[in-house]
């Protein structure tokens, strides 16, 4: 961190006079943060929250000083970056860091933020680039995103077949349910109508407060097994514990985990199992299509599907995965530890897809009319899901979130602003981006294809807001999922360790 302090001193020497005070405050904050990092493993660690508070206070003053200068948009961005750094350091005051990676988080977050700070500053002072070159770059990036979208739509739109000459393996459908009496009856009617020769259906009641247990029991005569869940143990989220309990109860060679709002076609399982066996896969996730048209849900639809298909995630070792519908080979899932490996993780599907990707045994497919796997979510449910998963997906790191929000704003909102201003390349970028959204929507939500022509800016702005709100909720509040808090303070401070007796 001494190098980090030196970097600020260099900036102070070349900065304008009116920026000297904010940078000096920033330097003081960094020095205090250095002391806090050094205190790890030392008796000073007992005062780490006080040190974090002082450091965050200096960063806050630095950002306010820059805002008060009012000398340009780029400098305001500079101040916003420092403000985000203040928020990140303030996590230490609330004990929101995990003890075993506290030092690493301080260091990596600092470098991410200061990369942005130095980039913004030098681009401003040296005038390395101009707006026209940025717009041209955006049009090129948008073109490549369109190409990736087309490639992935072809890759994940698999023509499935259920022609097999071997005996069908046993399959267990596993459904965790918590306070789902409004939708569970419809789902169980759907599951009990599925045609598959060796099928087991197990539904777990995850400590519901409504009529969920009674509804599950009412289908016992149709072969639905009822499992009563338990209060989450320490270190487990409720859903992950429920999924592990279902896995322990299952007897099938393959297990299919489904959310309650997913509907499976009458003949959908045979093609999925065939695809798993022919590809010798350990994991196959399915992105369900939308069942019905809901105007508001379509306008503010989750941008998650667009990102999964338009971004080259597999190139960076993280193949896309869909959590609502996941099919596993039971033996392989148990071999890696099942859900005990992700006991406190939000979005375990990403861990599993990354793990099985190392063995080239993972795949994802997009549902089609022929496959018939669908879902329907209310707008409020979509928002709740995004708040729950966005910040954990960004490593619960404000710096990573800031970078993601900045990239979204520059790519999508920047392109639209340039197009409205009359830029040809800005218009080209907008056409490419809308085309990507239109293609994805036409596959997963065909009835809303017309909405996808104009809803992209709304989706992006909504996603940016939800990402920031997710961060605020996780770091300084609570995140409730089905009336259960899933956000826990993760660092406990023990000022003085007890002596070990011989």
Range-by-range predicted roles:
Residues 227-248, 272-340, 383, 390, ...:
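Long helical/loop segments within the catalytic core of UDP-sugar-dependent glycosyltransferases
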Residues 205-214, 230-231, 262:
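A conserved acidic beta->alpha catalytic loop
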Residues 252-263:
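Short beta-strand-to-loop acidic/aromatic patch adjacent to the donor-nucleotide binding site
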Residues 276-279, 283-307, 331-334, 339-401, ...:
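Catalytic donor/gating beta->alpha subdomain of glycosyltransferases that bind UDP-sugars
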Residues 183-186, 210-219:
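Acidic helix N-cap motif at the loop->helix transition within catalytic regions
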Residues 13-23, 38-49, 62-75, 91-98, ...:
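Membrane-embedded multi-pass helical conduit in multi-pass membrane proteins
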Residues 189-198:
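Short, acidic, metal-binding catalytic loop of nucleotide-sugar glycosyltransferases
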Residues 169-172, 200:
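Cell-envelope/extracellular polymer assembly enzymes that use nucleotide-activated donors
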């Amino acid at each position: 961190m001494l190098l980090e302090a030196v970097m600020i001193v260099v900036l102070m020497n070349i900065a304008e006079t009116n920026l000297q005070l904010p940078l000096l405050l920033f330097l003081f904050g960094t020095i205090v943060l250095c002391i806090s990092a050094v205190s790890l493993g030392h008796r000073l660690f007992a005062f780490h929250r006080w040190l974090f508070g002082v450091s965050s206070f200096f960063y806050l003053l630095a950002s306010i000083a820059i805002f008060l200068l009012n000398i340009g948009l780029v400098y305001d961005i500079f101040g916003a970056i420092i403000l985000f750094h203040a928020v990140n350091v303030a996590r230490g005051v609330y004990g929101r860091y995990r003890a075993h990676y506290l030092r690493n988080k301080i260091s990596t977050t600092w470098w991410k933020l200061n990369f942005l700070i130095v980039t913004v500053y030098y681009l401003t002072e040296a005038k390395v680039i101009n707006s026209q070159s940025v717009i041209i770059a955006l049009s090129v990036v948008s073109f490549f995103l369109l190409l990736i979208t087309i490639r992935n739509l072809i890759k994940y739109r698999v023509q499935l077949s259920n022609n097999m000459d071997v005996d069908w393996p046993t399959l267990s459908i596993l459904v965790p349910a918590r306070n789902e009496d409004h939708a569970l009856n419809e789902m169980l009617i759907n599951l009990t109508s599925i045609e598959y020769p060796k099928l087991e259906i197990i539904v777990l009641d995850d400590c519901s407060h409504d009529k969920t247990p009674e509804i599950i029991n009412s289908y016992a005569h149709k072969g639905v097994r009822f499992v009563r869940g338990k209060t989450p143990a320490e270190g487990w989220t409720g859903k992950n514990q429920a999924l592990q309990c279902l896995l322990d109860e299952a007897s099938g060679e393959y297990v299919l985990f489904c959310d309650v709002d997913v509907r499976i076609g009458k003949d959908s399982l045979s093609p999925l199992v065939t695809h798993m066996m022919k590809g010798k896969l350990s994991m196959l996730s399915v992105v369900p299509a939308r069942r019905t048209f809901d105007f508001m849900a379509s306008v503010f639809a989750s941008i998650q599907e667009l990102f999964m298909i338009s971004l080259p995630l597999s190139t960076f070792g993280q193949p896309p995965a869909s959590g609502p519908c996941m099919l596993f080979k039971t033996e392989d899932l148990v071999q890696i530890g099942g859900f005990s490996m992700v006991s406190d993780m939000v979005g375990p599907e990403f861990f599993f897809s990354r793990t099985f990707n190392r063995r080239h045994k993972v795949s994802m497919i997009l549902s089609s009319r022929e496959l018939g796997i669908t879902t329907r979510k209310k707008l409020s449910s979509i928002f709740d899901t995004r708040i729950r998963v966005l910040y954990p997906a960004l490593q619960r790191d404000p710096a990573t979130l800031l970078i993601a929000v900045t990239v979204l704003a520059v790519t999508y909102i920047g392109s639209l602003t340039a197009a409205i201003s009359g830029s040809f390349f800005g218009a080209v970028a907008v056409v490419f981006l809308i085309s990507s959204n239109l293609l994805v929507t036409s596959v997963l939500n065909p009835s809303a294809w017309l909405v996808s022509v104009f809803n992209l800016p709304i989706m992006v702005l909504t996603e940016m807001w939800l990402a920031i709100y997710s961060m605020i909720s996780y770091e300084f509040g609570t995140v409730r999922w089905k009336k259960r808090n899933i956000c826990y303070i993760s660092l406990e401070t023990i000022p003085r360790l007890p002596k070990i007796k011989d």
